[in-house]
């Protein structure tokens, strides 16, 4: 049986980490693409030389030509720039929209049957634009946000309760930003909902509220510490979890930025919701019942995503 092919668009910190994880897990052969000559080739060569040490047989190549992604089963997109001090949201949107246009056209022309995972920020707008530019079906284009945000939420809760991270299960919905919605009613420690643990006296509502806020600003906290970059280990691990769910038809329920068409009262947007990922991509949007507070918070998040999309349409009229 032919090996699967994983194409990684963008060979920065996340792209390189994605390649390493995909090779370690033997997900398939790997193509690293970047517009900067030498970078994907150099990282591919370096990673290939990990093979004898780590015991993987994945073939890893680097390229500056979109033809190199032809026939990819999974494509993970990290290309674009990070927001820098003094850069407005519209500046970031303008730059990364152009990147998504080039990437979308490259995917459309070379790998139209791929399952595409977008990681580029601002995520909810970029995954929407990428689908528009690529013309792929909505179930085959998804954004990586909720898996990462939920991992951050789970980490902070495990620390607070002093329990194994394996026993913590959380959901973060909504947009990937300050308006995201960590849902405590569906967040559990070995099946026990967080609100019940608070009632038992194992934490306080004030501490849980602080953890919710820390989750919302989780990416910014890491940027503030690193000063010259942003998170890449956990984002890459999150993207790989989504790729595995598709490649291995795992039928996993994961929070992702997915296209919603009526679910949660939302139409025609990409927003963070629980979805079932299997061999057909996003096979189902899972509509869970939310309490009034979570519903209100989700609506605020949806409105923020709508604003981003309107800004995108203003920058590139072809999206209107």
Curated annotation (Swiss-Prot):
Substrate binds at residues 83, 89, 121, 152. NAD(+) binds at residues 10-15, 34, 96, 119-121. The keyword Oxidoreductase applies. GO terms for molecular function: L-lactate dehydrogenase activity; L-malate dehydrogenase (NAD+) activity. Gene3D superfamilies: Lactate dehydrogenase/glycoside hydrolase, family 4, C-terminal, NAD(P)-binding Rossmann-like Domain. It catalyses: (S)-malate + NAD(+) = oxaloacetate + NADH + H(+). The active site is at residue 176. One of its GO terms (biological process) is lactate metabolic process. It holds the Pfam family Ldh_1_N. It comes from the Bacteria. Disulfide bonds: none annotated. Keywords: NAD, Oxidoreductase, Tricarboxylic acid cycle. Its EC number is 1.1.1.37. Catalyzes the reversible oxidation of malate to oxaloacetate. HAMAP family: Malate_dehydrog_3. Belongs to the LDH/MDH superfamily. MDH type 3 family. This is Malate dehydrogenase. The gene is mdh.
